Amino acid sequence: MAKFKRTDTNRSLENLLDQDKSAQMSKNGGSLAKQPTRKLIPGHGLEFNNLSYSVIKKVKKDGVWINKEAYLLNDISGQALRGEIMAIMGPSGAGKSTFLDALAGRIARGSLEGTVRIDGKPVTTSYMKMISSYVMQDDQLFPMLTVFETFMFAAEVRLPPSISRAEKKKRVHELLEQLGLTSATHTYIGDEGRRGVSGGERRRVSIGIDIIHKPSLLFLDEPTSGLDSTSAFSVVEKVKDIAKSGSIVLMTIHQPSFRIQMLLDRITVLARGRLVYLGSPTGVAAFLAGFARPVPDGENSLEYLLDVIKEYDESTVGLDPLVLYQRDGIKPDQAAKTPVRKPPKTPKIPRTPYAKSPWTKHISLKSSHFSTGNMNSQRDPKDHSDQQSDVNNFDYEDDDDEDEFDKSLERRAPHTPMSMQSGVYPRLASHFYKDFSVWLYNGVKGTPRRPPTWNNNGAIKAPISGSGFKSMSSSQFSMTQQTPGPGNKTPIFTPGRDVIEYSSYNPSYEEVFEIEEVLDEPVHRHKFANPWVREVLVLSWRTTLNVIRTPELFLSREIVLTVMGLVLSSFFKKLSHFDFKTINHLLNFYIFTICLVFFSSNDAVPTFIQERFIFIRETSHNAYRASSYVISSLIVYLPFFAIQGFTFAGITQYILHLNSSILSFWLILYSSLVTSNAYVMLVSALVPSYITGYAVVIATTALFFLTCGFFLKRTQIPLVWRWLHYISAIKYPFEALLINEFKGSKHCYDGDLSDLSPGPLGDVKFSALRNNSRAALPQNCTLIGEDVLFSMDIREENIWLDIVILLAWGVLYRLFFYVVLRFYSKNERK
C-alpha cells in the first residue's frame, strides 16, 4: 500500500486510488504505455472538472413514445491558462458550442453537472458574467452604424460613468488599432443590401464590442466560420494578441488551417461530448503515434485525428479506445486498430447498475492525468483484451442486483478499467465500495461526483473511511460554504442545498474540510455599469441614429398614410352633408381608418426581430437593462407617431370637411399608433420568425376588428365570446371617433330609413336625449347624432375614457413586452 502525506490536501479520491493501484502494479512489475500529455497547473486559470450535460428527448420505441436522456457532454476535465488560446475542436455534433456554453455559464445550473473554477476557486454565474465576454457565431450588428459608433456605444454602456468621454474615445481608438480596423473607422457596418465592411472586419467588430471593457475571459463561438483563409487567420491573429494581454481565451473552431493551428496554445478535441485529446497542437502527432495510428506523410495531424475519430465512431468498438487512451494511456488491441464498420446505431441510455444508490446521472470518465495529484496511473497491458471484451459485451439495459454487482467489482477491481457506460468507477475495490455505500445510505442526499452543500458556518469535520485514501477535498468533492443572507449565491455548476448527516457511521479516522472561498460579485457592486437614466439616453441616441439613417422605417408608413388619406378622401365625398347615407359613409370611413392605422404597424415585426438578437447578445453580459431598452424605443418613436397621425388627420379633415374636432381626431389616431406598435412589438418578442409574427398579428388584429362593435354590436355577440369585445384594441378608438363625430344633438340627419339598410347601424334606436329635446329639434330632424351612438350600443359617451383605456392597453402591452425581454429572452440552454 502506498504511503500518503497527510499535508497534501489537493488530491482527489480517485487519484489516491490510482496511486494505490499504481504502487501495487509497480511492485508486480507492470507497466503502462504513456501517451504525451500536458500536465495541469492546479489553482491557475480556468479549471473545469467532470462537466456533464444531458437533455431529455422523446424517442419512439416499440410504437410507444418514451423519454430518453441524451448526454451532450460527458465528464470533461481540463484547464485553460491566462495568456493562451484554447481551441475546442471536433466533428459536427461533437458538443463544441455546448461545451463553450457550459464554461461560460450559459446553461441552466440545474441541468449541468461538474465544477468550474478560476484560480482554484469556485465561481458563481453572476461572477462569470462579470469577468467574461461571449462572442456569438453570428455577427449581430446594426448595419447603419459606423465601426467607430458601434464601439463608442459599447464603451458608453460597458464602461462606468466615472470614465470621461475623452477616455472612452481613447479606449475606442486603442481597440481600433489593436484589431486592425483603423482604416474602417468611419465605414458603415453594412448588410446584404448596403455596402459596408468586409466579412473579416465585421467579425473583428463583433469581437471588439465584447472586449471594450477588457474582460478576463473571452469565449468565441466559431469566430472563423464563413471567412476565407486569410480573413480567418487575421481574426485568430488578433485574438492571439488579446490573449497575450493576459486574458483567457477559449474558442470553438471547425477546421483550422495549419497557420491557425500554430497560433493555438492548447486544443480540446471532443467527439460525441467525450474528451478525446487535450494538449498542444504539436503533440497530436505523438498522441496518434502512441495510439498506433501514426500520421501518414503529408497529412495534417489534426485532420487525421478527426478521420480516426470518425472511423472509430462508425465501428463496432465505438469511441471507447480513443477515450481510454486519452484518459489512461491504454493502447487498443489489434482488433481495435482496424474497426469493423457497422450501420449507425442509436446508443441506449446509460443506466447505473446499482440503482438504489444516488450515484450521479452522468457517465464517469475521470482522467488520471487530469488530476492534480498523481499524473499517470500504472496498468498491466496484458489485461487489455479482457477489458475490451467487457466494453464490447456490456449491455446497457441490464441491471445487476447488489450481490452480483459487489462480486463483479471484486473480480474486476485488480485489472479492469470498466467501460464508460457502466457508471461505476473502475478502480474502486469491493471493500471500499461496501464502506462507501454505508456512508451513502446514512443520510447522503448528493452524489459521489457532485457533493452536497453544507449549511454549517464554521469549519466542518467530516468523517471518512480510511480505506486507501486520505481526503476528499479535491475539485470533485469540493465543499462550499452556504452563508445565510440575501447576498449568498450557489457557486456555478455546484449541487443543491441538501444536508448530509453521518450520525450512524463510525469512520477509521476524521478529516477536517476547509471551507472554500467562492468568487462572487461584490456585495455593493452594481449589476450594470451605468445608471438607468444614462442607459435610456445612450439607447435613445443609437435608436435615433438608426431611424434617421434608415428612412424607410419612418417614410414607408408616412407614405402609406398619406396616400391612403388621399384615396379615402376621393372615395368618401360629401361627409359634411346631413342625410342618412352620410351616416353609413361616416361609419365605414372611421372603421377603415382605425384598421389602416393598426395594420400599418405590422412593419415593426421584422424590424424588432432583427434587433432582438442584438438585444440578447448585448444583455447576456449585463450591458444594459431590459427596461432601458423598452423605454428608449418608445421615446424615440413617439414624435414619429405624432407626425404620422397628424398627416392622416389633416388630409382627411381638410378634404372631407368632417364635423368632428381635428384635435380629438389626431389624438385618437396618435394613441392608436402607440398602442398598435406596442402590441406588434410584444408579438415580435414571442414568435421565432417574422413570418410567424405577421401571421399572429394579422390573425389577432382581424379578431379585434370582428369584435369591435362594427360588424356585430355588443349585444349581438354570443355571451361566451363577449369578453373579446372588451379586450379588442380597435373597440376603443372606433367608439372614440364616433363619439367625436356624433355626440350631442347639434347634428340632425334626415332622409329615408331605407338608406340606412343594409349598413352597420342596423335597427335605429332613439336615445333619451332625443326624447327629452324633441320639442327643440327642427321639424325635418329624423335622427340626431346621439341616436346613432345609441343604435351602435355605445353607452359610455366619453372620448377621454376611451383614450385612457386605449393607452392603458398600450402600457400593458409594453409591460408584457418588458417581461418577455427580461425573463424569456435569455441565450441560455435549459
UniProtKB/Swiss-Prot annotation:
| List of glycosylated residues | N659, N771, N780
UniProt-annotated binding residues for ATP: G90, P91, S92, G93, A94, G95, K96, S97
Which chain regions cross the lipid bilayer? 552-572, 589-609, 631-651, 662-682, 691-711, 799-819
The region annotated as signal peptide is none
Is Transmembrane a UniProt keyword of this protein? yes
Q: Do you know what upregulates this one?
A: Regulated by RAM1 during arbuscular mycorrhiza (AM) formation after inoculation with Rhizophagus irregularis.
Location in the cell: Cell membrane
Q: Where is this region: Disordered?
A: 333-356, 368-422, 471-491
Q: Which InterPro entries match?
A: AAA+_ATPase, ABC2_TM, ABC_transporter-like_ATP-bd, ABC_transporter-like_CS, ABCG_transporters, P-loop_NTPase
Spell out the protein name for this chain. Answer: ABC transporter G family member STR
Question: What is the species listed in this Swiss-Prot or TrEMBL entry?
Answer: Petunia hybrida
The encoding gene is STR
